[in-house]
Amino acid sequence: MVSFTVQDRKLSEIEQKEIDDRVILWAKNKNFIFMMSSLHQIIWSNSSWEIVHHFNLVNNDNEIGLAKRKALLALHPDKQHGASAEQKYLATRLFSVIKQEWDIYIRKKEV
């Protein structure tokens, strides 16, 4: 008999869409700094992510870069050992969005 754990379960298209919608709503109209300072609002409670306060990021490129690196480490798809299917999918989506928004943030700073 084969037994499956919660981590082995695949998400349905409906479950994926619900997570996608949450990520879109969370990211909507936010710049990169606001995304980093609000990541705790969407990430699961027992993740390795530590809250980053907005006032620590404003005009502080070192803190912004550090927050980005910590977020990508916490969300990296290969680092989701023991996470549920929902957490893995959410991590993958957030990882992608944060990478995209970081690229936009860097391009705007270069102008």
Feature names for model-found ranges:
Residues 1-10:
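Eukaryotic long, low-complexity intrinsically disordered regulatory regions enriched in serine/proline
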Residues 9-111:
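N-terminal J-domain/J-like co-chaperone modules of DnaJ/Hsp40 proteins
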